[in-house]
Amino acid sequence: SFVEWTVFGPVPQDRQEEVRNNLLAGKSPAGLSPVQTRGGNLYFRTRAGAEGLFPKTKPGNTAWAETTFHSPVEGTMHAMVGFDAPARSTRRCSGVPAAGEWSQCGTRIWVNGKEMKNPQTYKLAGQRRYEKHTWNSPANEIPFDNEEFWWARPPVPFQVKAGENRILIEQPYTGEFQSWGVSFIPVKK
Protein backbone atom coordinates (compact mmCIF):
# COMPACT_ATOMS: atom_id res chain seq x y z
CA SER A 1 0.00 0.00 0.00
CA PHE A 2 1.12 3.55 -0.63
CA VAL A 3 0.12 4.88 2.83
CA GLU A 4 3.22 5.24 4.98
CA TRP A 5 2.80 5.66 8.72
CA THR A 6 4.82 6.56 11.76
CA VAL A 7 3.37 4.83 14.82
CA PHE A 8 4.06 5.86 18.42
CA GLY A 9 3.16 3.77 21.44
CA PRO A 10 1.89 1.94 23.25
CA VAL A 11 1.60 4.46 26.07
CA PRO A 12 -0.16 3.97 29.45
CA GLN A 13 -2.87 6.43 30.51
CA ASP A 14 -0.60 8.55 32.69
CA ARG A 15 1.49 9.61 29.63
CA GLN A 16 -1.25 9.97 27.03
CA GLU A 17 -1.78 13.72 27.34
CA GLU A 18 1.98 14.39 27.23
CA VAL A 19 2.46 12.25 24.12
CA ARG A 20 -0.63 13.69 22.39
CA ASN A 21 0.55 17.27 23.04
CA ASN A 22 4.05 16.50 21.73
CA LEU A 23 2.70 14.89 18.56
CA LEU A 24 0.29 17.76 17.92
CA ALA A 25 3.23 20.17 18.31
CA GLY A 26 5.23 18.15 15.76
CA LYS A 27 7.69 16.83 18.36
CA SER A 28 8.81 13.25 18.91
CA PRO A 29 7.73 12.10 22.40
CA ALA A 30 10.57 11.35 24.83
CA GLY A 31 11.35 7.69 25.34
CA LEU A 32 9.27 6.44 22.40
CA SER A 33 10.89 4.94 19.36
CA PRO A 34 8.68 5.49 16.32
CA VAL A 35 7.72 2.46 14.25
CA GLN A 36 7.66 2.94 10.48
CA THR A 37 5.05 0.87 8.67
CA ARG A 38 2.83 1.02 5.63
CA GLY A 39 -0.64 -0.01 4.61
CA GLY A 40 -4.28 0.94 4.80
CA ASN A 41 -4.85 -1.35 7.80
CA LEU A 42 -2.54 -1.17 10.80
CA TYR A 43 -2.97 -3.92 13.36
CA PHE A 44 -1.67 -2.98 16.78
CA ARG A 45 -3.03 -6.12 18.49
CA THR A 46 -5.51 -8.67 17.19
CA ARG A 47 -8.20 -10.22 19.38
CA ALA A 48 -6.19 -13.44 19.46
CA GLY A 49 -3.26 -11.40 20.77
CA ALA A 50 -0.67 -13.18 18.66
CA GLU A 51 -0.31 -10.63 15.88
CA GLY A 52 0.17 -6.93 15.33
CA LEU A 53 2.75 -4.26 16.06
CA PHE A 54 2.18 -4.51 19.84
CA PRO A 55 0.87 -8.06 20.51
CA LYS A 56 1.77 -8.12 24.23
CA THR A 57 0.06 -4.81 25.08
CA LYS A 58 -2.69 -4.81 27.70
CA PRO A 59 -5.85 -2.67 27.70
CA GLY A 60 -5.41 0.86 29.05
CA ASN A 61 -2.70 1.82 26.55
CA THR A 62 -2.91 4.10 23.52
CA ALA A 63 -1.06 4.27 20.21
CA TRP A 64 -0.88 7.02 17.60
CA ALA A 65 -0.55 6.68 13.83
CA GLU A 66 0.64 9.62 11.76
CA THR A 67 0.86 10.08 8.00
CA THR A 68 0.94 12.84 5.42
CA PHE A 69 -0.88 13.21 2.12
CA HIS A 70 -0.20 15.61 -0.70
CA SER A 71 -3.10 17.39 -2.35
CA PRO A 72 -2.54 19.48 -5.48
CA VAL A 73 -5.49 21.73 -4.51
CA GLU A 74 -7.52 22.71 -1.48
CA GLY A 75 -10.69 20.65 -1.24
CA THR A 76 -12.16 17.40 -0.02
CA MET A 77 -10.48 14.00 0.11
CA HIS A 78 -12.33 10.82 1.04
CA ALA A 79 -11.16 7.82 3.01
CA MET A 80 -12.53 4.56 4.29
CA VAL A 81 -11.98 4.87 8.04
CA GLY A 82 -12.46 2.24 10.73
CA PHE A 83 -11.15 0.99 14.03
CA ASP A 84 -12.87 -2.31 14.83
CA ALA A 85 -15.32 -4.75 13.29
CA PRO A 86 -17.20 -7.65 14.84
CA ALA A 87 -15.67 -11.09 14.92
CA ARG A 88 -18.01 -13.02 12.64
CA SER A 89 -17.97 -16.07 14.92
CA THR A 90 -18.67 -14.31 18.23
CA ARG A 91 -19.69 -10.69 17.45
CA ARG A 92 -17.04 -9.41 19.92
CA CYS A 93 -16.53 -5.78 18.98
CA SER A 94 -16.47 -2.24 20.31
CA GLY A 95 -19.68 -1.48 18.38
CA VAL A 96 -21.00 1.21 16.06
CA PRO A 97 -19.69 4.72 16.84
CA ALA A 98 -21.99 7.19 18.59
CA ALA A 99 -22.84 10.42 16.77
CA GLY A 100 -19.69 12.52 16.24
CA GLU A 101 -17.41 9.72 17.43
CA TRP A 102 -15.00 7.54 15.45
CA SER A 103 -15.41 4.50 17.70
CA GLN A 104 -16.81 3.51 21.09
CA CYS A 105 -13.21 3.41 22.38
CA GLY A 106 -12.31 7.11 22.38
CA THR A 107 -10.57 7.30 18.99
CA ARG A 108 -9.58 10.82 17.89
CA ILE A 109 -8.42 12.23 14.53
CA TRP A 110 -6.62 15.49 13.73
CA VAL A 111 -6.16 16.87 10.22
CA ASN A 112 -3.41 19.50 10.05
CA GLY A 113 -3.58 19.92 13.84
CA LYS A 114 -7.35 20.46 13.96
CA GLU A 115 -9.43 17.78 15.65
CA MET A 116 -12.14 16.37 13.42
CA LYS A 117 -15.33 14.74 14.66
CA ASN A 118 -16.91 11.97 12.62
CA PRO A 119 -19.35 13.72 10.26
CA GLN A 120 -21.37 10.54 9.73
CA THR A 121 -24.26 9.52 11.97
CA TYR A 122 -25.41 5.91 11.95
CA LYS A 123 -28.87 4.49 12.64
CA LEU A 124 -27.18 2.05 15.07
CA ALA A 125 -25.06 4.79 16.68
CA GLY A 126 -23.69 3.72 20.05
CA GLN A 127 -25.05 0.17 19.73
CA ARG A 128 -23.85 -3.38 19.06
CA ARG A 129 -20.94 -3.38 21.53
CA TYR A 130 -20.24 -6.94 22.63
CA GLU A 131 -17.34 -7.42 25.02
CA LYS A 132 -18.01 -11.14 25.48
CA HIS A 133 -18.81 -13.99 23.10
CA THR A 134 -22.46 -14.04 22.06
CA TRP A 135 -22.72 -17.80 21.71
CA ASN A 136 -26.00 -19.13 23.14
CA SER A 137 -27.38 -15.63 23.61
CA PRO A 138 -30.08 -13.68 21.75
CA ALA A 139 -27.44 -11.27 20.36
CA ASN A 140 -26.00 -14.12 18.30
CA GLU A 141 -29.25 -14.25 16.29
CA ILE A 142 -29.32 -10.56 15.35
CA PRO A 143 -28.44 -10.13 11.66
CA PHE A 144 -25.32 -8.10 10.98
CA ASP A 145 -25.83 -4.62 9.56
CA ASN A 146 -23.51 -2.84 7.11
CA GLU A 147 -22.93 -0.14 9.75
CA GLU A 148 -21.07 -2.68 11.91
CA PHE A 149 -18.39 -3.08 9.23
CA TRP A 150 -16.32 0.04 8.57
CA TRP A 151 -15.57 -1.07 4.99
CA ALA A 152 -19.32 -1.20 4.19
CA ARG A 153 -19.95 2.38 5.39
CA PRO A 154 -19.67 5.37 3.06
CA PRO A 155 -16.24 7.02 2.71
CA VAL A 156 -15.59 9.89 5.14
CA PRO A 157 -14.90 13.38 3.70
CA PHE A 158 -11.85 15.29 4.99
CA GLN A 159 -11.09 18.93 4.19
CA VAL A 160 -7.49 19.32 3.02
CA LYS A 161 -5.29 22.22 1.98
CA ALA A 162 -3.11 22.43 -1.12
CA GLY A 163 0.23 20.77 -0.36
CA GLU A 164 1.12 18.43 2.50
CA ASN A 165 -1.65 17.40 4.91
CA ARG A 166 -0.90 15.70 8.21
CA ILE A 167 -3.26 13.08 9.66
CA LEU A 168 -2.83 12.03 13.30
CA ILE A 169 -4.97 9.24 14.73
CA GLU A 170 -5.13 8.39 18.44
CA GLN A 171 -6.38 4.87 19.12
CA PRO A 172 -6.92 3.68 22.72
CA TYR A 173 -6.90 -0.03 23.56
CA THR A 174 -9.88 -0.48 25.86
CA GLY A 175 -10.40 -4.24 26.06
CA GLU A 176 -9.37 -7.62 24.72
CA PHE A 177 -12.69 -7.83 22.84
CA GLN A 178 -11.31 -5.10 20.56
CA SER A 179 -9.30 -5.71 17.42
CA TRP A 180 -6.94 -2.82 18.18
CA GLY A 181 -5.76 -0.92 15.15
CA VAL A 182 -6.36 1.76 12.54
CA SER A 183 -7.82 1.50 9.05
CA PHE A 184 -7.46 4.57 6.85
CA ILE A 185 -7.67 4.07 3.09
CA PRO A 186 -7.90 7.09 0.78
CA VAL A 187 -10.42 6.58 -2.02
CA LYS A 188 -11.69 8.52 -5.02
CA LYS A 189 -15.34 9.40 -4.90
Language-model regions, residue ranges each:
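Tight coil/turn sites that cap or link beta-strands
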Residues: 74, 161-164
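Surface-exposed intrinsically disordered loops and tails
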Residues: 126-149
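Short beta-strand/loop motifs in extracellular/secreted proteins, especially
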Residues: 75-77, 105-107, 180
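Intrinsically disordered, low-complexity Ser/Thr- and acidic-rich flexible linkers and loops
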Residues: 88-99, 133-138
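Short strand-turn-strand beta-turns centered on an Asx-Gly dipeptide
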Residues: 94, 105-116
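Extended extracellular/luminal ectodomain segments enriched in beta-structured repeat modules
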Residues: 60-62, 70-80
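Surface-exposed beta-strand/loop patches in extracellular or lumenal glycoproteins
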Residues: 77-82, 96-98
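Accessory carbohydrate-binding/adhesion or oligomerization-edge regions at the termini
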Residues: 1-61, 68, 84-90, 98, ...
